[in-house]
Amino acid sequence: MSRNVDKANSVLVRFQEQQAESAGGYKDYSRYQRPRNVSKVKSIKEANEWKRQVSKEIKQKSTRIYDPSLNEMQIAELNDELNNLFKEWKRWQWHIDHTLMEKKTKRKRLEDSHVLMNSGKLINGKRYFGRALELPEVKEWLKQSQRQNDGGSINTKCIPKDRNDFYYHGKVTAALTEFEANWTSILKAHYNVPVNEDEEEMSRQTQEIHVPTLADMEHWLVQRRKKKLMDELNL
């Protein structure tokens, strides 16, 4: 009995909707199946209504995907549905902007901004929404991407010990400075490169400077103390 009542009510509702649509143009788009081919819709008003239905469904499912009671399979299925809905929404948007709308406008509807804000994260050519970012394949892909990024940096631990010195890293040492000072003028003369007078003078002065050794410093300190002691004794 109840099934017959429900069937009669549904028939009555459909009849009333048809009358309302024919009389005043009212149509409950949520009760109809969306067209698969968006190009068949020639009315911009109808296209906007279908796009609004897609936006509502995206909003509902993007909220549901955060449900902690969902298992991994349900999350993956829901994420695939959201990917398909997002593609459908883009088809409607393109059809409206490039086919039906005579003059393009920058004004965005409220549901459009919601869809764009909740468009998920694009990973390896696919969008992932909400808890779908916690799926094993997503974590594995992010780990591989991180390893590839880390591989581009220099790891000094992999450098051989005999190469891990000042010369390998390009640090300036006294020996390197002396070598450059001695050979700069020679190499420039060999390759016919004009030598700057300031550089030549600096190179000559560098060659003339005697860098004291540790033994020289010890000898100098002994002589200084000896002279100071002799001055105190008036010798």
From Swiss-Prot:
Matching InterPro entries: Helix_hairpin_bin_sf, Isy1, Isy1_sf
Taxonomy, superkingdom:
Eukaryota
What's one GO BP annotation on this UniProt entry? mRNA splicing, via spliceosome
What is the protein's major site of localization? cytoplasm
| Any single GO CC term annotated in Swiss-Prot or TrEMBL for this entry | post-mRNA release spliceosomal complex
Q: Which residues form a coiled coil?
A: none
Please state where this protein is localized. Cytoplasm; Nucleus
By its UniProt entry, which SUPFAM superfamilies does this protein fall under? Answer: ISY1 domain-like
What are the record keywords, sorted?
Cytoplasm, mRNA processing, mRNA splicing, Nucleus, Spliceosome
Question: Has the keyword Cytoplasm been applied to this entry?
Answer: yes
PANTHER family to which the protein is assigned, alphabetical: PRE-MRNA-SPLICING FACTOR ISY1
Binding partners and assembly: Belongs to the NTC complex (or PRP19-associated complex), composed of at least CEF1, CLF1, ISY1, NTC20, SNT309, SYF1, SYF2, and PRP19.
Remaining remarks: Present with 1990 molecules/cell in log phase SD medium.
Primary role: Involved in pre-mRNA splicing and cell cycle control. As a component of the NTC complex (or PRP19-associated complex), associates to the spliceosome to mediate conformational rearrangement or to stabilize the structure of the spliceosome after U4 snRNA dissociation, which leads to spliceosome maturation. The cell cycle arrest of SYF2 defective cells may be due to the inefficient splicing of TUB1. Also involved in DNA repair.
According to its UniProt record, which protein family does this protein belong to?
A: Belongs to the ISY1 family.
The protein's name: Pre-mRNA-splicing factor ISY1
Give the organism, scientific name.
Saccharomyces cerevisiae (strain ATCC 204508 / S288c)
The organism's taxonomic lineage, starting at the top: Eukaryota, Fungi, Dikarya, Ascomycota, Saccharomycotina
